[in-house]
């Protein structure tokens, strides 16, 4: 008997990947792409890799798999795996293969301790909309259980259908980097001018039901402010933006932001990734462009301590400007210190007209060298 998360893997998949696949299928966009998988931990003996490969082999189609194997040692930042296939054959597999790897690498989870982290995150959110984005970080068999805990502790929703039943709804989400990178690959290959973020927003609005909020990811090309302004200026419907700037980058404009005195840990104020300065700059930039109506969703490492710091910044921002700094929090680690989270990113695409692989990644996540990977399929 097959495990449910293999047989019904789409129910365990972050909804934005399923929506992206639907958009790409309907628009006929299907370049050959390369993904890379890595983690930021040194690991003496890998686990879960062979099982993830088996899942990809079973559910994928015409996918070239290059990977390390269970038992191999691993150094932080090197590739664990690379995958090559048409994007429509890969994009909806990501959540589950990461879940298989992350779950095995982390090992057993104390659900009582996890519940404490969920409760602390909810309490820290102080009434903000807070969503469970944890599916890729935990073993597939825990996704349903964790979603239930989140619902019981007050969260507003989750990213997977298997978990969303506890809210009597379906999984929700925004838009992923993969959608905009795929669109950029198509534009590059065909010599099409334009903004991939704006084009992704246009296609999302074209194909997705009108009741789904148009929350557009703005950090793919490290133009968190200007890409969203440019998208809105085209007249495309956009309801908000999500900021998920990776730890390799400073958010656009954040280094020039002057912050008031804030009673929070300095590590949350400035630096790379999603910081208070980056969200402050994004809100001010959108407002100054006349886009006060756009909501802001924040994600990337938001445990209870980080949420509390951002909520304090929101309080100060509201006192100064009379409106919220941000509106929605996406979280998934819940403060658990032993989590080993794997990440998967598009890093290249095959340009058929030129007959060669070309770099294609979100800014800061360029392709990593890989001498130890071996072909599995």
Functional labels for PLM-detected ranges:
Residues 1-209, 287, 318-323, 334-377:
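Ordered alpha/beta subdomains of enzyme catalytic regions
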Residues 74, 80-83, 294-307, 312, ...:
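Conserved catalytic-core segments centered on acid/base and nucleophilic motifs
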Residues 130-132, 170-172, 213-215, 238-242, ...:
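Structural preference for beta-strand elements that scaffold enzyme active sites
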Residues 135-138, 218-222, 296-306, 332-334:
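Glycine-rich beta-to-alpha transition loops that act as phosphate-gripper elements at the mouths
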Residues 170-278, 282-286:
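Glycine- and Gly-Pro-enriched alpha-helical subdomains that act as flexible
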Residues 224-233, 302-320, 324:
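Catalytic cores of alpha/beta
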Residues 268-276, 280, 284, 289-298, ...:
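Active-site loop/helix belt of alpha/beta enzymes
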């Amino acid at each position: 008997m097959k495990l449910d998360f293999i047989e019904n893997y789409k129910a365990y998949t972050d909804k934005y990947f399923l929506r992206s696949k639907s958009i790409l299928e309907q628009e006929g966009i299907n370049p050959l792409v390369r993904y890379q998988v890595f983690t930021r931990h040194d690991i003496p003996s890998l686990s879960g890799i062979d099982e993830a490969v088996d899942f990809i082999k079973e559910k994928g189609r015409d996918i070239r798999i290059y990977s390390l194997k269970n038992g191999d040692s691993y150094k932080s930042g090197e590739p664990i795996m690379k995958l090559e296939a048409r994007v429509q054959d890969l994009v909806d597999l990501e959540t589950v293969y990461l879940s298989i790897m992350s779950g095995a690498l982390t090992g057993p989870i104390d659900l009582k301790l996890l519940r404490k982290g969920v409760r602390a995150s909810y309490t820290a959110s102080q009434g903000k909309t807070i969503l469970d984005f944890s599916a890729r970080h935990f073993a597939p068999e825990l996704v349903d259980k964790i979603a239930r805990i989140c619902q019981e502790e007050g969260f507003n929703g989750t990213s997977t259908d298997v978990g969303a039943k506890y809210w009597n709804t379906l999984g929700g989400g925004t838009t992923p980097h993969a959608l905009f990178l795929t669109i950029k690959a198509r534009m590059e290959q065909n010599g099409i001018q334009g903004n991939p973020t704006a084009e992704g927003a246009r296609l999302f609005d074209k194909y997705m039901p009108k009741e789904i909020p148009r929350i557009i990811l703005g950090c793919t090309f490290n133009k968190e402010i200007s890409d969203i302004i440019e998208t809105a200026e085209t007249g495309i419907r956009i309801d908000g933006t999500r900021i998920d700037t990776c730890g390799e980058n400073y958010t656009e404009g954040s280094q020039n932001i002057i912050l008031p005195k804030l009673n929070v840990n300095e590590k949350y104020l400035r630096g790379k990734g999603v910081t208070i300065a980056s969200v402050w700059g994004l809100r001010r930039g959108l407002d100054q462009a006349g886009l006060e109506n756009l909501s802001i969703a924040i994600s990337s490492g938001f445990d209870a301590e980080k949420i509390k710091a951002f909520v304090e910044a929101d309080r100060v921002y509201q006192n100064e400007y009379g409106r919220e700094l941000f509106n929605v929090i996406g979280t998934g680690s819940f403060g658990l210190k032993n989590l080993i989270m794997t990440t998967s990113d598009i890093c290249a695409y095959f340009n058929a007209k030129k007959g060669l692989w070309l770099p294609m990644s979100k800014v800061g996540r360029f392709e990593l060298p890989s001498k130890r990977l071996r072909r599995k399929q």
